[in-house]
């Protein structure tokens, strides 16, 4: 009986992702193949799933969209692509997804997603207000004879 359940779940994984091509696409993007119930989709196109047969912490996941705000994100996914209301549900801060219980609007939450610019030339670098402890050596400029 257990072998039948394993085979049944394997067939569900292949058919649930749209055949072999869809299965490979999900595997290369997420490095994991899971099946679950679609809980909802955010305004950017990210899809959120849940499978209560998995253990806590691995039972909720997101499949990121391939295009966000005009940028191709097929290979360049980032954890900051999840909106705050879905972040609450994804990290088990609440049991109700935003589709059934929408959160209250806050003025500090962005209306449109801004990409994480860390480790890029656009990153924020604060101005240093303290003096350097170590100064680089500048050789004296004496003309050669």
UniProtKB/Swiss-Prot annotation:
Annotated compartments: Mitochondrion inner membrane
Keywords: Acetylation, Electron transport, Membrane, Mitochondrion, Mitochondrion inner membrane, Respiratory chain, Transport
Highest taxon of the lineage: Eukaryota
Bilayer topology annotation: Peripheral membrane protein
Principal subcellular localization: mitochondrion
GO BP terms: aerobic respiration; mitochondrial ATP synthesis coupled electron transport; proton motive force-driven mitochondrial ATP synthesis
Residues found modified as N-acetylmethionine: 1
Pfam assignment, any one: NDUFA12
InterPro entries associated with the record: NDUFA12
A single Gene Ontology CC term: mitochondrion
Chain's role: Accessory subunit of the mitochondrial membrane respiratory chain NADH dehydrogenase (Complex I), that is believed not to be involved in catalysis. Complex I functions in the transfer of electrons from NADH to the respiratory chain. The immediate electron acceptor for the enzyme is believed to be ubiquinone.
Subunit (UniProt): Complex I is composed of 45 different subunits.
PANTHER family: NADH DEHYDROGENASE [UBIQUINONE] 1 ALPHA SUBCOMPLEX SUBUNIT 12, NADH-UBIQUINONE OXIDOREDUCTASE SUBUNIT B17.2
Similarity section: Belongs to the complex I NDUFA12 subunit family.
Protein name: NADH dehydrogenase [ubiquinone] 1 alpha subcomplex subunit 12
Gene that this polypeptide is encoded by: Ndufa12
